[in-house]
């Protein structure tokens, strides 16, 4: 019988995930959270600048539904709150501190107080407003500390980037970073073939694609994030392809990044996927791209903007 081994495999995967210790967030991961929450929650119109100035200053203002849901987004992204448990995760604060304490100048006593404060509050029903009201007093008291812990100062983040060349740097696309990480520098021949969307199937190229999928947030340890792939099609004005994209991914026989990548490239949406993928490469080097009001203007515009990136293999 086939079902039993499959079910057992799923349970084993979940067990391994649950057993893994929580890992501190690096500056790239934190920056992604902030910018993505901006993208998802900043309103259009004249009020946008007001919110942007306030949030940039780490002020959770104005006290309204927009800021409430922005705050929830950041708390989830920084993993200070778990949606599935409807609970704050205060035990992760000292882990974050230990990882960067020699660089971020955070005070250990204050870290303990911050942890205790977060442990003392209740998430209620987990709604945006409930989380906001619970966390706001903690935020206001420990905002300077939390900025140090979660890479929210320009100086602090720059210091960590400089000390950790092994993480993705600002201005570096995830495609370039992953090629560097897996190959230790560009395997120019295979990388050029790969960026021309040839499916070499080599073990190293599969690792590069896995790294890229994780960097673009298409995947994490729990599996494929279909909504993230669909979002990239939406951003190149191809929202009408959503049913087909979902169908292609759902019918893919493998569950690894390279499997999904291959399925998309062997599907009727392959040309649109290439355009979406290339556009995300550009944005992965500049998390503020969309926030500056820039939009997709076609593959030629993407190629032109890619020429200004020094850390990628150009088209």
Swiss-Prot record:
In the UniProt record, the signal sequence range is 1-18
Q: Does the keyword Signal apply?
A: yes
Q: Which Gene3D superfamilies match?
A: Pheromone/general odorant binding protein domain
Is Translocase there in the keyword field?
no
- Record's keyword terms, sorted: Blood coagulation cascade inhibiting toxin, Disulfide bond, Hemostasis impairing toxin, Secreted, Signal, Toxin
Look up the record and report any one GO term of the cellular component aspect. Answer: extracellular region
Check the record and name the SUPFAM superfamilies matching this protein.
Answer: Insect pheromone/odorant-binding proteins
Provide the disulphide bond pattern: 37-73, 69-128, 178-211, 252-263
- Residue ranges annotated as coiled coil are none
Q: Where in the cell is it found?
A: Secreted
Q: Name one GO molecular function term.
A: odorant binding
Q: How does it assemble?
A: Interacts with host coagulation factor XII/F12 (inactive and activated). Interacts with host coagulation factor XI/F11 (inactive).
- State the function annotated in the UniProt record: Modulates blood feeding of female mosquitoes on vertebrate species by binding and sequestering different mediators involved in the host response. Binds leukotriene B4 and leukotriene D4. Exhibits anticoagulant activity targeting the intrinsic coagulation pathway; binds coagulation factors XII and XI, preventing generation of activated FXIIa and FXIa.
Family the entry assigns: Belongs to the PBP/GOBP family.
Name listed for the protein in its UniProt record:
Long form salivary protein D7L2
Lineage per the UniProt record: Eukaryota, Metazoa, Ecdysozoa, Arthropoda, Hexapoda
Its gene?
D7L2
């Amino acid at each position: 019988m086939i079902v039993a081994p499959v079910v057992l495999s799923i349970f084993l995967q979940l067990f391994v995930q649950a057993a893994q210790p929580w890992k501190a967030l690096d500056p790239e991961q934190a920056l992604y959270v902030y910018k993505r929450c901006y993208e998802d929650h900043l309103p259009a119109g004249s009020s946008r600048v007001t919110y942007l100035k306030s949030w940039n200053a780490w002020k959770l203002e104005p006290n309204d539904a927009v800021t409430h849901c922005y705050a929830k987004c950041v708390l989830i992204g920084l993993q200070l709150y778990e949606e599935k448990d409807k609970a704050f995760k205060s035990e992760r604060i000292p882990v974050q501190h230990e990882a960067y304490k020699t660089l971020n100048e955070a005070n250990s006593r204050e870290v303990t107080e911050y942890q205790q404060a977060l442990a003392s509050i209740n998430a209620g029903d987990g709604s945006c407003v409930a989380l906001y009201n619970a966390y706001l007093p903690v935020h206001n008291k420990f905002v300077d500390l939390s900025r140090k812990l979660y890479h929210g100062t320009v100086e602090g983040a720059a210091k960590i980037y400089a000390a950790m060349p092994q993480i993705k740097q600002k201005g570096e696309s995830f495609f370039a970073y992953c090629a560097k990480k897996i190959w230790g520098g560009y395997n120019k021949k295979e990388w050029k073939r790969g960026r021309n969307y040839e499916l070499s199937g080599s073990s190293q190229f599969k690792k590069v694609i896995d790294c890229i999928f994780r960097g673009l947030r298409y995947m994490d340890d729990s599996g494929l994030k279909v909504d993230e792939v669909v979002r990239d099609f939406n951003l190149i004005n191809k929202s009408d392809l959503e049913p087909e994209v979902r169908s292609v991914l759902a019918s893919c026989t493998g569950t690894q990044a390279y499997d999904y990548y291959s399925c998309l490239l062997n599907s009727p949406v392959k040309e649109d996927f290439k355009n979406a993928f290339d556009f995300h490469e550009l944005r992965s080097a500049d998390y503020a791209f969309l926030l500056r009001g820039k939009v997709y203007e076609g593959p030629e515009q993407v190629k032109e903007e890619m020429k200004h990136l020094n850390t990628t293999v150009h088209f």
